[in-house]
Structure formats: structure tokens, C-alpha cells
């Protein structure tokens, strides 16, 4: 159990680091995230991502967006949908994950993550 939890937490921490760097590179804040794919099946992962990012996460009713995208493109090609706006109307939210921790706890956990990453750098030697 602890190994699985640590793996999911590392995904959330890594996502937080990536989003932070993206905000710096873009020069603007990412307000919220839309999540999909197999990992979004984990309520635990989605909640801690929301907590660590301090952002709302929106999970659609259909998380298999690659397959849906292919179906939408095929539908557009044969005229089933008239345009992309009609497709966008099909997107429905199943669940919204909202931050549930204080800024103090978030900072403490992120500091611990960065400390662990720093220490692990010495483990790999040429």
C-alpha cells in the first residue's frame, strides 16, 4: 500500500513541478486543469494533484479522450457533426476536484518533496 501511495504522490508532485515551470515559461497562471486518461480513475491522485497545485481539476464523464478524439474527427469528416463547437457541447464534467489543504501544509509537503529529490540526485553516480 505505501509503495502505491508513494508512486501516486510522486506523480502529483512531478505534475506540480511541471505546472509551476509552465507558468514561469508562459508568464501567466494556469487557472485549472482538465484531466483524463487512466490515471484520472484514481480519486486519490486527482485530489492530491488538486491539493498540491491549489487548482481545480475537471474530470470528464469519458476519460478515454484519445478514442473520443478519433471518433470526433471521423464524425467531422463524414458530416456527423457540423463543426468543433458542436463537439465541445458534448464535453461533460463528471467530477471537480478542489483543493482541500491549507497553504501551510501544501508548502510543507512540497518542501519535503524538493528535499527528497535533491538528496536522491546523489544516488546516481557515473
For every predicted segment, state its role.
Residues 1-126:
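Glycine/Thr-rich phosphate-binding loops that ligate phosphate moieties of nucleotide
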Amino acid at each position: 500500500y505505501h509503495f502505491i501511495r508513494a508512486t501516486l504522490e510522486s506523480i502529483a508532485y512531478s505534475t506540480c513541478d511541471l505546472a509551476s515551470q509552465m507558468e514561469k515559461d508562459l508568464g501567466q497562471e494556469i487557472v485549472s486543469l482538465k484531466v483524463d486518461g487512466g490515471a484520472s480513475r484514481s480519486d486519490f491522485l486527482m485530489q492530491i494533484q488538486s491539493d498540491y497545485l491549489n487548482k481545480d481539476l475537471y474530470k470528464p464523464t469519458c476519460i478515454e479522450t484519445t478514442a473520443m478524439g478519433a471518433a470526433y474527427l471521423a464524425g467531422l469528416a463524414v458530416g456527423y457533426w457540423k463543426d468543433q463547437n458542436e463537439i465541445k457541447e458534448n464535453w461533460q464534467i463528471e467530477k471537480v476536484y478542489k483543493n482541500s489543504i491549507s497553504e501551510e501544509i501544501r508548502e510543507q509537503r512540497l518542501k519535503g518533496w524538493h528535499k527528497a529529490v535533491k538528496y536522491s540526485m546523489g544516488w546516481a553516480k557515473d
